[in-house]
């Protein structure tokens, strides 16, 4: 007797096999597409790394740092075994979509240009006020370098040996007779200070000063690399020249430095004459702050400086040469020799093409996500 399978059961078995082989084929196809997209995006990033600045004017050191962190991830996940094709394809598509959209939506940034033609003889000063929040007092003076290239800052701060605060701590001790004594212990810590965007209001609160002076959209992460100061926020002075450190503090803390990326010329985004400086606690809260005011101007009386406008991009003559800064006393003595050399204007910082490519990649990669699910 020949056994015959009912047509209904045969249909179910055929459908099951069809679904099994169909899903396997679909997984294989999605895996191949995802791997191809990995390769495409890898070569796109490779092109960003090695293209000349004339082709990609917005590809600067800061963007290279961000893109470089993505390459190891791409290289590792692009060679998964075939057995993991289904889950890998989904993760790959999601990662590619997010990374491409993140690249597209990122705020356009550029390295800060050196400031030139800063007016000579003008001095801006920020004087830290008397406040119950901290005993830190002092002044920060700023004037253009004698070459007109950048700004020389001179810090004279004191009050770090107050009873309580970020640099000292009050310890209660007991001697052999059980007599209580108080001892001030010096803490090993560092404190940041920055130029902030807005001035301090009349009530003296440091909160409304907003964020650091950052006209080029760099942001606070990753942290400033002092070996590449042009990639830092122009207002991040402690990031570029070092924090206030207790190990070097006695009665006064004095420091003089030449910053090439801030300006005393009104109208530029890097102008700080109507902004503020903020000193932070070691836990990043704002300890004290003060406004910069014009205290010296050659040949004229002190006048109000209007709020700056513009992008801070400089197109002018860039002097070359060396300068020497002396830190004797509270007023810096600066000498410099330089020869102005005309150079071409920097290229226009237009990120439209890069953002268009990013959005296109993001759309393509996002379309792969439903295939992987």
Swiss-Prot record:
Keywords: Antioxidant, Cell membrane, Cell wall, Copper, Disulfide bond, Glycoprotein, GPI-anchor, Lipoprotein, Membrane, Metal-binding, Oxidoreductase, Secreted, Signal, Virulence. It is found in: Secreted, Cell wall; Secreted; Cell membrane. Its cofactor is Cu cation. It catalyses: 2 superoxide + 2 H(+) = H2O2 + O2. Its EC number is 1.15.1.1. Residues 329-348 are annotated as: Disordered. Residues 353-373 form a propeptide. Cu cation binds at residues 194, 196, 212, 280. The GPI-anchor is attached to the protein in the endoplasmic reticulum and serves to target the protein to the cell surface. There, the glucosamine-inositol phospholipid moiety is cleaved off and the GPI-modified mannoprotein is covalently attached via its lipidless GPI glycan remnant to the 1,6-beta-glucan of the outer cell wall layer. Residues 1-55 form the signal peptide. GO terms for molecular function: metal ion binding; superoxide dismutase activity. Belongs to the Cu-Zn superoxide dismutase family. Superoxide dismutases serve to convert damaging superoxide radicals, a key form of ROS, to less damaging hydrogen peroxide that can be converted into water by catalase action. Degrades host-derived reactive oxygen species to escape innate immune surveillance. Involved in the occurrence of miconazole-tolerant persisters in biofilms. Persisters are cells that survive high doses of an antimicrobial agent. This is Cell surface Cu-only superoxide dismutase ARB_03674. It comes from Arthroderma benhamiae (strain ATCC MYA-4681 / CBS 112371) (Trichophyton mentagrophytes).
């Amino acid at each position: 007797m020949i056994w015959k399978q009912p047509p209904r059961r045969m249909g179910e078995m055929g459908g099951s096999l069809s679904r099994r082989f169909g899903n396997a084929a679909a997984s294989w196809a999605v895996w191949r597409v995802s791997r191809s997209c990995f390769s495409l995006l890898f070569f796109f990033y490779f092109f960003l790394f090695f293209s000349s600045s004339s082709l990609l004017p917005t590809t600067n050191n800061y963007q290279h740092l961000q893109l470089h962190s993505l390459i190891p991830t791409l290289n590792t996940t692009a060679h998964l075994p075939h057995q993991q094709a289904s889950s890998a394809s989904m993760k790959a598509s999601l990662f590619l979509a997010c990374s491409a959209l993140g690249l597209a939506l990122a705020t356009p940034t550029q390295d800060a240009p050196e400031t030139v033609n800063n007016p000579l003889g003008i001095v801006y000063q920020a004087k830290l006020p008397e406040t119950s929040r901290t005993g830190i007092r002092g002044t920060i003076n700023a004037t253009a370098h004698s070459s007109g290239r950048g700004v020389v800052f001179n810090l004279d701060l004191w009050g770090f040996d107050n009873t309580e605060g970020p640099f000292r701590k009050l310890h209660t001790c007991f001697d052999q007779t059980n007599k209580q004594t108080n001892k001030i212990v010096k803490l090993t810590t560092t404190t940041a200070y920055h130029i902030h965007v807005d001035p301090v209001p009349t009530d003296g609160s440091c909160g409304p000063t907003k964020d650091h002076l950052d006209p080029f959209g760099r942001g606070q992460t990753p942290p400033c690399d002092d070996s590449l100061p042009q990639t830092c926020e122009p207002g991040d002075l402690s990031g570029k020249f070092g924090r206030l450190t207790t190990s070097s503090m006695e009665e006064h803390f004095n420091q003089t430095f030449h910053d090439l990326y801030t300006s005393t010329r009104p109208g530029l985004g890097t102008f700080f004459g109507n902004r503020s400086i903020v000193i932070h606690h070691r836990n990043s809260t704002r300890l004290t702050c003060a406004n910069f005011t014009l205290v010296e101007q050659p040949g004229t009386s002190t006048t109000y400086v209007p709020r700056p406008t513009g992008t801070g991009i400089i197109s002018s003559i860039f002097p070359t040469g060396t300068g020497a800064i002396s830190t004797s006393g509270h007023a810096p003595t600066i000498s410099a020799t330089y020869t102005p050399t005309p150079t071409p204007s920097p290229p226009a910082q237009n990120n439209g093409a890069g953002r268009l490519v990013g959005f296109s990649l993001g759309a393509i990669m996002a379309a792969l996500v439903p295939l992987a699910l």
